[in-house]
Amino acid sequence: MNEGLNVVAFKEMKVPESLAMMHYDVHKDKPFFPWLVDFISSAPVLTMIFEADNAIQKIRDALGATFVQKADPDALRGKYGIWAGINIAHASDAPETAAKEIELWTNEGGLTESSDAEEEARAYITKYAVGDVDYTMEIRNTVKDAIENHDTSDSVPQKLTELLSKDAEGIPSEQIEALAKVIFDFVIEEVEKS
């Protein structure tokens, strides 16, 4: 779509827990594994396959650092990530990983290559990129303030749900609430660690 990247597969989907577990299998023994599974399966995600010379590095450069606070403000994670690993996107880190993930998402997630994929991706962006209103910073600050102030009250998930609802027209309320809950679970973990 830019940087010489071609979208060869595009699909919006609700990720089943079983697929989320397979995707993050490399982290299965880590304490954050259950949270990762909940996060990726809480609301719809976009799955894509890009094709280009040096595609992996180009995508990783466009996304920025994994942790939002370390990402360049002009990178996608810097602009739209929420906090720490709530970073809006996953990207393969090596050709071997990409091959494994492409196989997983095509076989288990129904992602298919299509000559219409680029057009579908552009239509999706056009549909959701209306207006100049963006609640990312409000969501980010809600999470940051809750962690810094050790606030695990009911007002935090309520505020997250309210902000996510404004930013997610057409997405069912139960999916918005599920995403708000997963983000709040992260807040609770961070508060308990400090």
Residue ranges and their predicted role:
Residues 1-194:
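Non-catalytic terminal and connector segments of soluble metabolic enzymes
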